[in-house]
Amino acid sequence: MENMFRRVIFEKKALDYPMGRDILRQFENTDIEIRYSETGRITGIPGKDEAQSFFEGKNTLVVGVRRELDFQTCKPSANYQLPIVSGCAAMCEYCYLNTHGGKKPYVKINVNLDDILSKAGEYIEKRKPDITVFEGAAISDPVPVERYSGALKKAIEYFGKNEYSRFRFVTKYADISELLAVQHNNHTTIRFSINTPRVIKNYEHRTSSLEDRIESAYNILNSGYKTGFIVGPVFLYENWKKEYEELLKKASDKLGDKELEFEIISHRFTTSAKNKILKVFPNTKLPMDDEARKFKFGQFGYGKYVYDKDDMQEIKEFFINNINLYFNKATIKYII
């Protein structure tokens, strides 16, 4: 995977940790700009307008220390978020993180990983004998920066040694070769977000191809991990059924007889997300016509535009029928 970043900003305290010093060594003697923050405040990322600020933020890696060690909950997919990375290097036009990362949404690696995992251990102890599940990709895609941090590898090993814990994350990236030989003890699930080639080309900028994601899922399974696919967001456009069936068939050609879990997520958007997207991607082709959708209040107190009842029924019937057709041992966790 090519380097995605134009600049790296190190919090001074990050250099007190072995991971911080190791990451610095990796960027020394390269053409990537290195800066330092004495206070931990991240400044100096250029941007004359909202669009430029967004893209320059995406091209910035921050190496810092996680100060707040209490974990956020992550229901229904897990008990807690595991805050090893925040922000995402991908530039998916539809992403809900577009409204959560500020005007300059940089990627941050937290180098005090031992402290974070120790805190995870406290949560595990409190919930014993129940299993505690941690989600590593709630506010990030951690795979693009794994080459610098090794944090996923260490987390997988940590949870693999604890019978009362499980770890899971999802990615749009295929660069998982360094995780294949990790001692995971079948405690980690690595899922892949997939979509039609049309959607990937138009909206999922700076991510791996569909073919590479499927190949990586195959390699993950062969290394003993559990895996699955998030198909989403599902868009209803001309010939959508044909293209999504081709997507499922392509995955089936490689994984049709494997145990997989599917999560199907239809496209939805909020007014604030739409306004942000139109500023950053003024020529976007995203279907965001309020009149063509149903308005629905969400659990967090704000409303979103979703497909109506008839469209959702069509989506559910399509994916249930075709997943059952192309996959022998697949389960569908949800279709929303």
Curated annotation (Swiss-Prot):
Cofactor(s) in the UniProt record: [4Fe-4S] cluster; S-adenosyl-L-methionine
Domain Radical SAM core: residue ranges: 74-305
GO CC term (a single one): endospore-forming forespore
DNA-binding region: 215-232
Reactions catalysed, as given in the entry: (5R)-5,6-dihydro-5-(thymidin-7-yl)thymidine in DNA = a thymidine dimer in DNA
Keyword set, alphabetical order: 4Fe-4S, DNA damage, DNA repair, DNA-binding, Iron, Iron-sulfur, Lyase, Metal-binding, S-adenosyl-L-methionine, Sporulation
Role played: Involved in repair of UV radiation-induced DNA damage during spore germination. Can repair thymine dimer 5-thyminyl-5,6-dihydrothymine (known as spore photoproduct (SP)) by in situ monomerization of SP to two thymines.
Subunit note: Monomer or homodimer.
Protein name per Swiss-Prot or TrEMBL: Spore photoproduct lyase
Organism field: Clostridium acetobutylicum (strain ATCC 824 / DSM 792 / JCM 1419 / IAM 19013 / LMG 5710 / NBRC 13948 / NRRL B-527 / VKM B-1787 / 2291 / W)
Gene that specifies this protein: splB
